[in-house]
Amino acid sequence: MALDTANIIEQLKGASILELNDLVHAIEEEFGVTAAAPVAAAGAAGGAEEAKSSFDVELTSAGTEKVKVIKIVKEATGASLLDAKKTVDGAPVVLKEGLSEDEANELKAKLEEVGATVTLK
């Protein structure tokens, strides 16, 4: 069975965030790997720690205002209402990856304002 990379990429483009998240977990389980970014080795003793340049926003809990959280997730991710609901129901889940510190803090503040619990990674 020959794999056509372009075909696979096209199929992935049409997948929802929830479907892509499920795919990543299935690959991790099947191959015994992790999708986490590799951690840089510690520098020389006494060296200044490098500032983090990109952040992932993880929804830990929707809290009591679930409808408001779904609305914010829908707006932030561009997902359909149903996909946004599935994403919120699947918490804890990473909502957005690779955001700048300002973007990540802005999304975190919006979600926390309506009672959600959010962590930045």
Swiss-Prot record:
Instruction: State the GO CC annotations.
Output: cytosolic large ribosomal subunit
Assigned keywords, A-Z? Ribonucleoprotein, Ribosomal protein
Single biological process term from Gene Ontology: translation
What are this entry's molecular-function GO terms?
Answer: mRNA binding; structural constituent of ribosome
Task: List, alphabetically, the Pfam families matched.
Answer: Ribosomal_L12, Ribosomal_L12_N
Top-level taxon in the UniProt lineage: Bacteria
- Describe its function: Forms part of the ribosomal stalk which helps the ribosome interact with GTP-bound translation factors. Is thus essential for accurate translation.
Q: How does it associate, per the subunit comment? A: Homodimer. Part of the ribosomal stalk of the 50S ribosomal subunit. Forms a multimeric L10(L12)X complex, where L10 forms an elongated spine to which 2 to 4 L12 dimers bind in a sequential fashion. Binds GTP-bound translation factors.
For this chain, the family text in UniProt reads:
Belongs to the bacterial ribosomal protein bL12 family.
Q: Quote the NCBIfam families the UniProt record gives.
A: L12 (TIGR00855)
Q: What is this protein called?
A: Large ribosomal subunit protein bL12
Q: Which organism is it from?
A: Lactobacillus delbrueckii subsp. bulgaricus (strain ATCC 11842 / DSM 20081 / BCRC 10696 / JCM 1002 / NBRC 13953 / NCIMB 11778 / NCTC 12712 / WDCM 00102 / Lb 14)
Q: What is the lineage of its organism?
A: Bacteria, Bacillati, Bacillota, Bacilli, Lactobacillales
